[in-house]
């Protein structure tokens, strides 16, 4: 098959350092590069990537539309977005959310699955696949979008 390269990014320099430590030894991936990036202001040129994964991040961003705009910019024509994101059930426990935020898990967006699907669809992506992975306390909605 065709081999390519991978770019792993995070907003936190400490997370990048930890990821680099884990990419060592006999299972080291030579095609993997690590870089600190702000998803709302990426330093990559336009239409650089075939695929972008933004995992468990959209709901913790004050302005996720900025990240989606940047992802749209750096994706090639017909590029694919994978966006696994924590979602909430209708009537979720306000107490549970309060408790999670006190523990440091701050969320700005408490989307339900269909709300997230509509949101991403309104930001320049055609939703071509989605799956709900049930979990406790939160479920995860794995959304696949194609750049329009």
Residue locations for each model-derived region?
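A short SAM/SAH-binding and catalytic strip from SAM-dependent methyltransferases
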Residues: 51-63
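C-terminal alpha-helical "lid/dimerization" subdomain adjacent to the S-adenosyl-L-methionine
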Residues: 82-141
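C-terminal lobe and adjacent flexible extensions of AdoMet/dcAdoMet transferase-like proteins
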Residues: 143-148
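Short glycine-centered segments of the SAM/dcSAM-binding site in methyltransferase folds
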Residues: 5, 79-80
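Short N-terminal helix/helix-N-cap motif within the alpha/beta-hydrolase-1
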Residues: 14, 62-66
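A short glycine-rich, Lys/Arg-flanked "PGG" loop and its adjoining helix->strand segment in the class I
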Residues: 65-77
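Class I SAM-dependent methyltransferase SAM/SAH-binding core
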Residues: 1-41
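A short acidic, Gly/Pro-enriched loop at the edge of an enzyme's catalytic core
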Residues: 37-52
């Amino acid at each position: 098959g065709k081999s390519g390269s991978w770019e792993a990014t995070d907003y936190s320099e400490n997370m990048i350092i930890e990821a680099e430590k884990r990419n060592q030894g006999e299972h080291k991936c030579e095609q993997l590069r690590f870089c600190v990036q702000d998803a709302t202001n990426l330093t990559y040129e336009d239409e650089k990537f075939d695929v972008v994964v933004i995992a468990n991040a959209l709901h913790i961003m004050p302005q996720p539309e900025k990240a989606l705009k940047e992802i749209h910019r750096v994706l090639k024509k017909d590029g694919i977005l994978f966006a696994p994101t924590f979602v909430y059930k209708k009537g979720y426990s306000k107490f549970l959310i309060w408790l999670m935020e006190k523990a440091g898990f701050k969320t700005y967006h408490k989307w339900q699955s269909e709300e997230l699907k509509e949101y991403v669809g309104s930001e320049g992506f055609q939703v071509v696949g989605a799956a709900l992975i049930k979990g406790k306390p939160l479920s995860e909605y794995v959304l696949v979008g194609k750049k329009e």
